[in-house]
Every structure is written in structure tokens, then in C-alpha cells.
């Protein structure tokens, strides 16, 4: 996949969670709401490279504004109760309007103001609560007021940095009080939002696994049939839960949450609301991160169709969607369509005053030109982007390093090795500068990209050294199992190329175990990794294990790529060789016969690869007629040598 990024770069995670917690507390406790408050910045936020451009970094939670809560109204015995809760998830754009103002008169509904996700209105109430006939105060009212007070204290502790653990304890106590105050188990919106706050504090403490059950509980409480308020409260919880799953690398669970949230949003706002389009883009980004590109393209097309329906062509939101679509098309090899979308995105951003961000799209445009072998145009696009980024971001910005890497790749492809090495050195200088503005993930991504160029220049040991550094960085980051698995798989190929077959086997084994744990057992990447591990087994004379790996890879690649794809054909050739080695001649002949037939049709009979496999097939047929006279032969003649490179794993 293209090197580069997700979204905006959020380097200070602690500050991010501080503002997230404050925003969630505001949802509960502040009277005023505003539909101008910034939401979590999605792919189209710009400001740095796109989600895909950073080699599928994990979904980061977005920035939220600072707020004040529980303001005194001048009367000690009164507190402002929320007229509406701005139920904004820390993850997605929840700029949802429950009811337009012109509908208020028709429905007779009062106290419904325009907000991002307005989920309910309440009036001021005396702190003492309601008096019962016996003169005692209603306990549930006291519980609610105490819970709000505890949330205020928790917010202050988080803001001051005094004790986040104490803040967590207070939010748990507040949640229990809200739960106890719920009438006859009836869902309480304040309770739901308190759980959202509690989960956000857990995330600030990097206790993601503890946050997940809290958020799961928060999405179980709302009853969608109760109305828009409950539906949108559930939407907020689902999006926050999806983000938390992403932080621990559970992308499939994350996508399920986003999808369910999107369906709720559609039900409330309608299929063609522009805000639904923004959530579509968010889901598409997650699908890209999970390497589910076909689904990501479909969701992104839905977002673009919403822009067409809204009659707002060339908007910033459409530019974001086209940028994402361009990168999806580029990843799928549809370079012409990718170029079209990226050029339109660049024009739209320039028209909307986003000149500083055009540089990032110019980088992607250069990628498309490079893929189309239009090298002169690619150089122009990269140089234009490089000049703009140096001016806007500075000489040592990671985005500048990213363009250096692309230029190094371009010059290496065109045989200008000296220029390629020079640009690699410039990029390394940036990533090894210990610049605090560069996040660890950006450094790891940059080192990984440089290693690919080093490998192509036959500097294999240097490539492994860079990958080891990247691996060490990612090992300390949550939710990076897929990235770590990808690096390990690439290292496995390099070890194989160096003849270090045991090291290759061990790194592939580690990579595959991580891919299984993250649910990536049905991806093309997983199938290719299995095939490569099988090759390492062949070299270690572990033929039976190699057969098992090849057969598993066969099932995956047939489903994901089809029986005529080059990757599948190479796997067939390897499996045929392994079958031959263990005496399963009929199976070997059947597979190799299919490979030869397809190769002749696609490549012609004079192609060297076709000729080699025809000779192998002829030998197998000869041996099948005289099994007792079989001669031992090296396993190296049984495998497809074309698949012993790492290109397929990038």
C-alpha cells in the first residue's frame, strides 16, 4: 500500500484525551450547546497526509475543544441542568440535527434547539430534589445532583493533571449513582453519557481493554424505539466503541460498530444527509485500514453520491472524499481513475482556500503518475509538493521526508542510483533527527519505506536494520498488530533472500500469528504470507508443514484473487512441487497442468516461465508412468522462484 498516513497527525495523546473527556463532561453538564463546535477531524481535515498515506496507521481520536462545566447561575441552591446533551463521540463527526427548527411548530415540541446531536431537554431544578409527602427528599434526585458534582470534580482533576486515577474513580461512582437514579430501570441519558466519560478516562490511562466493556454497556442501554435522543446516544457510543476497538487492533469489531452507527444515523437523518456522507468517509477509512478495499470503495462512492444529491459540488467534504477515493483506486491498481479523483480533489481544495493542503494531494498525484510510468510528470508533482511543504511546514517536517522517499523511489526505478541514495539520506536525516514534532508512528513508517528502497538496491542488511528499528517503535504502540505483522513478513522475505531460512521461518510464524489474532485470515496479504512461510519450510525440509501452509494459502487466494491470478498461479506451482516431494503425483500433475494452461494462454508458449513449468509437468507425467524409477531431485526445482521476493507483501 502507498506510504503515507491517515488523517491529521495527533502526536500528543494525553492532551487529546483531556479535551475528549472535557467535551463528554460538557455533554452532561453544560446548559449551552453549539452547532459550531469542531468535531473529530476526519480524513478530509487535512493538515497532514491522509489516512492511507501513513501506511495504514491506527485510527486516532480527534481533537475537541476546551469547555467549562457546571457553571453557577448565581444561586447556590440551583445548578444548570442540561437542556440538551451535545452527544459528540470522540471519534466521528456527530454533527447531527435531531429536528429542524421549522418542524418544531408542526410537532409542538418545545425546548428542542439545534445542536450536534441534541438528545434531550431538561429544566433547572433545586439541588435538594423533590419533597415526598413525608417530608423526605427523593433519593434519586440527590443521586443525580451528586453524580453531576462528581463528574465536575473528575473533569477538574483531568484538566489539572493532578490524578487521572482519582478522576476515574469519581466517574465510576457517578455512573453508579446515575444507574441507581434511573426510574424502574428506564434508560437514563445522563447515565449513558457518564459511561462515555468513564471510558474516555480509561483510554487516557491507556486502559483500552477496560474501556471496552464500559462502552459496550453504554450502547446496550439506549432504546432506539424511544426516539431520536436514544438513537443518537447509541450512535455516539458506537462510534466511541469503534475507536477504542481500533486502538487495540480489533479492526473487524471496530468496523462493525461504525457500520451499526452509520445505519442509526441514516435512520434519523435520512440517506442523503451530508453528515451521513461524513460518517461514510470515516467508515471507508476504517475499511481501508483493514485492507477491505472493495468495500471501502463502495462506501466512498456512497459519500460522493450524497454530494451530488446535495447539489454542492466542489465542497471541502467532496474534496476529502475524492482524495480518499483516489488513494483507494491507486491501491487497487486503477491508476487512471485515481489520478482523476486526485486532480479534482486538488482543484476543489484550491477553490475553497485550502492551498496549504494541496501539497499533500500533489504528492498523491505524483504517486499515480509514477505508477503510470509518467516519470517526468511525477517529478514535477513531487517537486511542487516538496517546495510547498518546505515553505509551509519546515525543512524537517515528516511530510517533507515522505516526499524525499518518493523521489528516491522514482530515481531508483529510472536507474539513477546516486540521486536515489541522496534522497534516502535526506529522508533518514529527518526521521532520525529526534524531532519531537514527529510521532513514533511516522518515524516507523518512514523507516519502513526507506527499507523497501534499500532492498531494491540490494542493500538487504541495511533494509533489515531499518525494519528492526521500525519494529521496535511499533512494539510500544497500541493497536499496531497489523503494522507489526507486515514488517515481520517483510523481514521474513529479506532473511529468506539472505539464506537465513530459520530466521525467515520464525519471523513469518510471528507475523502469521498476529494476523490470525487480528482477524485478517481471509486477506490476500495473509495468503501471500502463508505462501512465503511455506517456502521457508521447504528450505528447512519441513515438507509436511509446507504443504499445510500452501493448502491454506490456496483456499484464501482462490477466494480473494481467483484461480487465474498470478499470485494464485505461483502458489499452485509451489504446492505442486511440495505434492511431488511427498509422492502425491496426481495432485501435483493436476495443479501444474492448470498453471501451464493459464500461462500459455496469458504469456504464450515461448515465455521462459511457461517453458520451465512445461518441463516440470513433462517430468511429472513421465514419473507417473514409471513411479518406481523416480530420481531424487532438489526441492529448489519444485518451487516457483518468482515468489521468493517481498514485492507481493508491500
Curated annotation (Swiss-Prot):
Family annotation (InterPro entries): TPR-like_helical_dom_sf, TPR_rpt
Q: Which family does it belong to?
A: Belongs to the kinesin light chain family.
Q: What is the superkingdom listed in this entry's lineage?
A: Eukaryota
- Keyword field contains Repeat: yes
Could you list this entry's UniProt keywords, alphabetically sorted. Answer: Repeat, TPR repeat
Where do Polar residues bias regions lie?
131-141
What is this protein's record name?
A: Protein KINESIN LIGHT CHAIN-RELATED 3
Region entry Disordered, spans:
104-141
TPR repeats: from-to residues: 192-225, 235-268, 277-310, 319-353, 359-392, 401-434, 444-477, 485-518, 527-560, 569-602
